[in-house]
Amino acid sequence: MLLNSLFPSILAAATFVTSAAAEDLPPIEIVGNKFFYSNNGSQFYIKGIAYQQNNLDSNSTFVDPLADADNCKRDIPYLEQVDTNVIRVYALDVTQDHTECMQMLQDAGIYIIADLSQPDESINRNDPQWNLDLFERYTSVVDKFHNYTNVLGFFAGNEVTNNVSNTDASAFVKAAIRDTKAYIKAKGYRTIPVGYSANDDSDIRVSLARYFACGDEDESADFFGMNMYEWCGSSSFKASGYESATDDYKNLGIPIFFSEYGCNEVTPRKFQEVGTLFGSDMTDVWSGGIVYMYLQEENNYGLVSVSGSSVSTLQDFNSYKSEILDISPSSVQASAESASGVSRTSCPTNTDNWEASTELPPTPDKDICDCMSSSLKCVVADNVSTDDYSDLFDYVCAKIDCSGINANATTGDYGAYSPCGAKDKLSFVLNLYYEEQNESKSACDFSGSASLQSASTASSCAAYLSSAGVSGLGTVQGSVRTDTSEATTDSGSGSSNSGSASSSKSTSSSTSSGSSGSKSAATAVTVTTLTKIAAVGVSIIVGFGLITM
């Protein structure tokens, strides 16, 4: 009798678990300067943790944190203990499969914000470029992860501009944002926000944020992250600088959050800033933050230490847990935010502290570069190492005008072939030199570094080459190509349909239906908990079955 009375309830619970586990997290959408769940319009606050080994200064290798299912299985329960709903990952290997980790994160109610670059494929502040190689890297990450609805967004750059000496580099990052957004749209993927993560340099931070937020929506950042380390030890809203920062960004018009935070100048960290960040002084402007970082390393920023499959929580973990579980931020509905009509900020003017032009670098277009390369008679030899390119550039460009391959983001002047790859650009200037020397055979040698080829111009190339001009000083309108990426989409769940995130399913039983930061949200039954209930239920059924046999 007892079994008969329990069975319907247990079966119902098990059925609910199966349904919940299969349900995708609703995409997060942007309305005004806030994030919202797309399924019910409730506000979403980022309660995040940076999740990657800190080996990103290397130019060769990095560890993809989402390609190791065992590590994800080990770490996610600890992320859940501190109510994490976002992790930030800084570099991903598109040749790996991420299905298992992404599904485990999905089941735990955790979204990701992923950087599109990797250590040796990123925009270099000292020699900024937005070229075909970078475009293909960025779009390969998009192709790999677009299908997961728990991808909150992408960062197109991290601290690329970090002081007054390199503000021009921001133009290249903004061009990357423009073209990544255009690529997502052209591929028919769901709307996935693309933003930027900045350092907190007092001389440029306001202009930097305004630069990325301003202008046409097709080329502006969808959100802005600030790596904020001003609050150290015991401080306050005013003394920490949080008050002035909040005032600085109150009219930005797009979501802003701490893309890193957690000063460790005073240890152990108390994380008293958490209550302020999610309190009434800041939540109208800020949308939460991402604690730096999960793993303990030499930099002493870790919340846990790891040895193989074993995890040990540190004092910082316990302090953060105490603070983050005690927040109860106010929230609004997307409909109310939409009605408020938040407007975007205006672009900064060029000053001594800000020199990035609002005229952005051109879109990398493989067709244009291929047409140019095929039309050349003198080209760099295939056996020349890319390490030797700089010497050849220096020599040739000291003798001829290389403006056709150069990019000046201060004046907004860009050569027609500036987005092409290094080999194509070097061949172009070698050919210019060769032609200026009346095509003397000796002018296409460079000690064996150059060689002659048969030039050809396809009919489809004529318009490109004519617009660019012989010296590449003309203007050629590139277009976003959708057939350049070699990355394949992971087999994980998620919608790949086009259109706004708001077109997603109207219900989700695996995520909070209210504010992600509220205390009540923390008491919601998670999929993990329900799975345990189902397992217990099955055990009870088996046990009673054995008893009645």
Swiss-Prot record:
Residues 1-22 form the signal peptide. SMART domains: X8 (SM00768). Keywords: Cell membrane, Disulfide bond, Glycoprotein, GPI-anchor, Lipoprotein, Membrane, Signal. It is a lipid-anchor; GPI-anchor. Residues 336-361, 479-519 are annotated as: Disordered. Residues 336-356 have a biased composition (Polar residues). This is Protein EPD1. It comes from Candida maltosa (Yeast). The lineage of its organism: Eukaryota, Fungi, Dikarya, Ascomycota, Saccharomycotina. The gene is EPD1.
